Amino acid sequence: MKRVKTYIPGLDEILYGGIPERHIVLVSGGPGTGKSILGKQFLYNGLTKGEGGVFIALEEHPVSVRRSFEHFKWDVRKYEREGKFAIIDTFTGGIGNVAQREKYVVKSIDDVKELSENIRAAIKDINATRIVVDSVSTLYLTKPAMARSIVMQLKRVISGLGCTAIFVSQVSVGERGFGGPGVEHAVDGIIRLDLDEVEGVMYRSIIIWKMRDTKISMVRHPMDITDNGIIVQWDKYLKISNWSVSIQPLPENEISQMKKAVEEAEKEVEVKVEGKEEEE
């Protein structure tokens, strides 16, 4: 099976090599859990490896999107100038001088046809393989009755063009859902991020809730947000109760299996790169 490595430290290990190619993965969590960071890190890491990326901004101004990348010193403007990165602006509706300079603008988020056409154009223009939609929760606020069908339409377009995508989804503080009725059934995978308070201390964690066609880690892992982005402590698991927190090492056999899976995925990437170079 072909996989897309996230290159996020520790994440490919708990995914046993990476995300299966063409999968649509929901990254869900409450405020401050790192959902958008994970999506942007996935996109930027691909850019550094020569993979084109498209960011679909549903609830953030394009200027803010670029600024948020820069916070981690991820220079997406460089790749934008090189024609390897694009932003699809559905936030401004094309209103304002700054918005008018954007190449891909969707004037109404309700216009699924216009959105799909912009996605197709951007993917083809930059030969994109990685897509991030932030966030699909906006669809449930603006078009709750049509939200699931819109998500399915986006999935058909993105996957049909050979891309692998992350859909960011918001949930309320303390909520253990995934951010919208039925969305969890429309996607191929779910990654859940959490931020829990225990005795006045905050703990970050990540768990792979589901991922079709691949083995996954079945425990909750500690994670950190650093100046360089997200780091997953893939060789440890987190146990949280109302009064205590325990971080334990994974069994050695699981660690070995994860390492082996990542090594095999890396070999697949090397073969893919070599084949691409020969074609050129």
UniProtKB/Swiss-Prot annotation:
Which keywords annotate this record? ATP-binding, Nucleotide-binding
Domain KaiC residue range list:
2-246
Q: Which SUPFAM superfamilies match?
A: P-loop containing nucleoside triphosphate hydrolases
Pfam families given in the database record: ATPase
**Residues binding ATP, per UniProt:** G29, G30, P31, G32, T33, G34, K35, S36
Q: The organism sits in which domain of life?
A: Archaea
One GO MF term:
ATP binding
Q: HAMAP family, from UniProt?
A: UPF0273 (MF_01076)
Spell out the family assignment given in the record's similarity comment.
Belongs to the UPF0273 family.
Under NCBIfam families, the record lists:
thermo_KaiC_1 (TIGR03877)
Q: What is this protein called?
A: UPF0273 protein SSO1861
Q: Identify the species of origin.
A: Saccharolobus solfataricus (strain ATCC 35092 / DSM 1617 / JCM 11322 / P2)
